[in-house]
């Protein structure tokens, strides 16, 4: 798993790796300010996993080309697409080079591809999900595996099976590369 933007989600993944996967999953965390991440690491985590203390734009694209089918690129970055930004690099340099079968998680994506009203009212002027929506329209290279907010809003009866998700349904989308240029 390569995670762009590290923090509490990193800790959750590391815990799941320990409890359910016998610590067999290797992580690369790309985080220019890893103080929080380092504080969350358990003894031994730093020897098994890598932390690249730099902006994702400074990471060679070849790092992402190492991902194989079933591997995960987990994106929780600035959420803003603009000149020279992390998202610009990820969407235009990294995603087109990913191999068939690579799974992509993008955090803070809501259905129907609109941010919560409260976020806009409090100055979260993100634009990531608008660009993602445009990218997905008529795109046969990417398929949607799971869209948490869509399930929560459209298939509410399914959430009855998972009552904790009703409290905090989150906002993320899981995609899969179906055809590859890389």
Language-model regions, residue ranges each:
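Catalytic metal-binding/acid-base residues of hydrolase active sites
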Residues: 7, 33, 78, 110
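Short beta-strand element of Class I
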Residues: 22-28
């Amino acid at each position: 798993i390569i995670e762009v933007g590290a923090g509490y989600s990193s800790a959750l993944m590391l815990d799941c790796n320990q409890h359910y996967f016998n610590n067999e999953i290797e992580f690369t965390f790309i985080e220019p300010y890893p103080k929080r991440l380092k504080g969350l690491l358990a003894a031994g985590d730093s020897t098994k996993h890598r932390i690249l203390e730099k902006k994702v734009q400074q990471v060679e694209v070849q790092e992402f080309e190492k991902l194989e089918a079933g591997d995960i690129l987990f994106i929780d970055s600035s959420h803003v697409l603009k000149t020279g930004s992390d998202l610009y690099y990820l969407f235009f340099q990294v995603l087109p080079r990913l191999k068939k079968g690579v799974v992509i998680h993008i955090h803070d994506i809501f259905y129907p591809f609109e941010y919560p009203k409260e976020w806009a009212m409090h100055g979260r002027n993100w634009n990531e999900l608008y660009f993602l929506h445009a990218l997905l329209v008529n795109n046969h290279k990417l398929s949607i595996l799971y869209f948490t907010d869509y399930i929560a809003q459209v298939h509410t009866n399914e959430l009855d099976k998972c009552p904790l998700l009703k409290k905090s349904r989150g906002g993320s989308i899981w995609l899969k590369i179906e055809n590859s240029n890389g």
